Regions:
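Short hydrophobic membrane-inserting helices
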Residues: 1-83, 87-90, 119, 128-135
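Intrinsically disordered, low-complexity polar regions and short flexible loop motifs
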Residues: 3, 15-20, 107-381
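Transmembrane signal-anchor/signal-peptide helices with a preference for the extracytoplasmic
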Residues: 83-109
Length: 381
């Protein structure tokens, strides 16, 4: 009988160890309480069994221990029933947790599928960007002595597409600002550089003929004069098929090295591009808030998105933000906390506040191990 007691005690110990490994570390406090209650029943069952074994060992007339059998049966039956109830409860709970894990895995797969679909659409948006422009080709005819005897200029249609569009956009925006800077130098009122940049971006985005080219801090007469001057520059550029591309600015040369008619606007291209890019970032961040992914995973997914953006795309994103069009980008820290400007070519930022200065407060709050805000460093070398 002593062997039976030892075996029973071993079962209790194994139950405790398994309960700890399977439930205490993994599941809720409710399960811990249930396991403690179950353990209490097992302890009671152990002492009941020990008492029964002692009675059987000391019995002289087994015909008189029938009441003990009834007693033991009365104790064991409900204990076994309770044990069975708890065992079934644990089984149902384990199944519930398993189903929950399956659901979470499905949600994770659904999220990844949607994210990579949005990533694919972003790449399509970039690849489908197109500007129909012009180019001038010079063909020379040589004689036998290799002297030029004839020069023929022909004009061809030039298509700028894909990421090259953003390269030209940066040139156009900077040139537009430099034209405004030169015009403002002789105007009766001197406007702040940031206001000139905001007006330049509106002209760049909507086109110089748009009624949306207006700014509260700049007089309408100045804006009308700017529009007239830009139309003249556009006509020279277009009539020369981009050969007339260097103009005199304020103590500098304005280099309008693009192959299409400048200052006609990019609203139809950039509007959709920025909306989709913003929606993709917002989608990832919202999934973090829902608890589906953590902050590190959000950064990893957005790093994949950012890797699809060229330096000029990030440069245009910064300009779009700094002049106010894209101010919502920083409401939830998309540019800083989630590092959407991490690869920004800081040295190419012209006429706007230095990004290191603009985001200085956030840079000072970065903790060790969180990584720099900018790939090129958060402190100017």
């Amino acid at each position: 009988m002593a062997l039976v007691a030892i075996i029973f005690l071993a079962i209790i110990i194994v139950s405790i160890i398994l309960g700890w490994g399977l439930f205490f570390k993994t599941y809720s406090k409710l399960l811990i309480a249930a396991l403690i209650l179950l353990l209490s029943f097992l302890v009671l069952l152990f002492f009941t069994t020990i008492h029964s074994i002692d009675v059987l060992d000391n019995a002289k007339d087994y015909s008189k221990i029938g009441p003990y059998g009834d007693y033991i049966g009365g104790i064991l039956n409900p204990l076994i029933a309770v044990f069975a109830v708890f065992a079934a409860g644990f089984a149902f709970y384990a199944q519930y947790e398993a189903n929950k894990q399956v659901q979470d895995q499905f949600k994770s797969q659904q999220f990844e599928s949607q994210f990579f679909e949005m990533l694919r659409l972003h790449k399509e948006n970039v690849n489908e960007m197109k500007i129909t422009g012009y180019d001038s080709v010079i063909q020379e005819t040589l004689d036998n002595e290799k002297k030029v005897v004839q020069i023929v200029r022909s004009h061809n249609t030039k298509i700028i597409e894909g990421r090259k569009v953003f390269v030209s956009m940066v040139v156009e925006l900077i040139s537009c600002y430099e034209f405004l800077e030169e015009i403002n130098s002789t105007w009766k009122v001197r406007y702040d550089p940031i206001d000139l940049l905001k007006l330049s971006y509106r002209i760049f985005f909507f086109g110089s003929n748009s009624e949306l080219v207006i700014l509260e801090k700049i007089d309408i007469d100045f804006i009308d004069h700017v529009k007239i001057q830009l139309r003249k520059h556009r006509k020279r550029h277009r009539d020369s098929y981009s050969r007339k591309n260097v103009y005199q600015g304020l103590n500098k040369k304005i280099e309008l090295f693009i192959k299409y008619s400048p200052f006609t606007g990019h609203e139809n291209r950039l509007g959709h591009y920025y909306r989709h890019l913003y929606s993709t970032v917002k989608y990832v961040v919202n999934k973090e808030r829902e608890g589906l992914i953590d902050y590190k995973q959000s950064r990893d997914y957005l790093k994949i998105l950012r890797s699809q953006m060229s330096n000029d795309e990030q440069l245009m994103l910064y300009y779009n933000y700094i002049i106010g069009f894209g101010k919502d980008w920083e409401n939830d820290g998309y540019l800083t906390k989630y590092r959407m400007l991490h690869n920004l070519p800081i040295d190419k930022v012209k006429y706007a506040e230095n990004p290191r200065v603009h985001f200085q407060e956030f840079i000072n709050s970065i903790k060790p191990g969180e990584g720099h805000l900018f790939e090129w460093g958060d402190v100017e070398q």
